[in-house]
Every structure is written in structure tokens, then in C-alpha cells.
Amino acid sequence: MLKKINLFFYLFYFLFFSSWSFAGERNDKNLLTFGAGLWDWNDSQTAGLFNFEYRHGTRYGPFKPMIGGLINTDHGFHIYAGIRMDLYLTDKIVITPSFAPGFYERGDGKELGHVVEFRSGLDLAYRRKNGARIGVEVHHLSNASLDENNPGTETYLFTYSIPLN
């Protein structure tokens, strides 16, 4: 039990305190991100996926706001707003966990059980000298049991982020 508590505190320190100094040393710009990948890739209702996202460069504590939307080839879409946290492994490699609640319309695709869906994810990106990023992202969408029907879905995307300022 003590080992689990110690592990929790080390993880907490790394995510919240060390990331502040890493992200604070960067002059991050606002980013416009485009992505393409697969929706529900680990299930029988796989569809193509396209994503568009605005990522604000200003930090509020360790977090940066984002807003975006995705549409799949089954005419379903998810519009969301949330937070991200850049964790720099090196000057060029960035890992970014994110969380965003949003509104979901299924189209002809998978029924996720509720109009409100929460997107949690992780992306890994290579940051170029001009601030642009090339990356890969994985996400899970779920209604967090707001409805009895809560199958969730997984997505993955290849992304390109363009610095805006």
C-alpha cells in the first residue's frame, strides 16, 4: 500500500510540478490542428475520422484550453471544448494528455448512449523549429454512465498542427 501511495505522489509531482517548468520554458504558439484517422477502430463499426482543433498557447496553471470538432464517415460528429497539458520529454518531443466534454450526434454510426460525451486522450508529437507539430493521438469517448447504454469508442488520428502567431 505504501508503494502505491509513493508512486501516486511521484506521478502527481511529475505531471503537475515538473510539467509547469517544462511547459513554462517554451514559447508555445496558438495551434490550428488537422487530423485524420479511424473512429471506433477496435470494434465492428469502424469509420474514417477527420478532426479540426484550435489549441490556445497560453497556459492557465499547467493547462491550455482547446476547442474542436470531429466528423466521421458515418456522418456522426462530436463538438467539444476542454483542456490539454503539454509535457516536454525533450525540446522536440511532446506528450499531451487532454480532456474535453462535448456534444455528440451519431449520424449513421455507433450509438454512444447520450448526447453528452467526454473525450479523454493522449498525443505524442514531434515539435519542429517553427512550432509546428506532427503527431499521433488516441482518444476514448464515453458518456461516463450518464446513460445505462455506455459502450464508448476509441479513435486514433495522425495530426499536423500549424502555429498561428
Where are these regions (language model features)?
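Outer-membrane beta-barrel initiation region
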Residues: F22-H56, P163
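Outer-membrane beta-barrel pore domains and translocons
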Residues: G35-W39, R55, L70-N72, R84-D86, ...
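Outer-membrane beta-barrel architecture
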Residues: N51-R55, G82-R84, D123, T159-S161
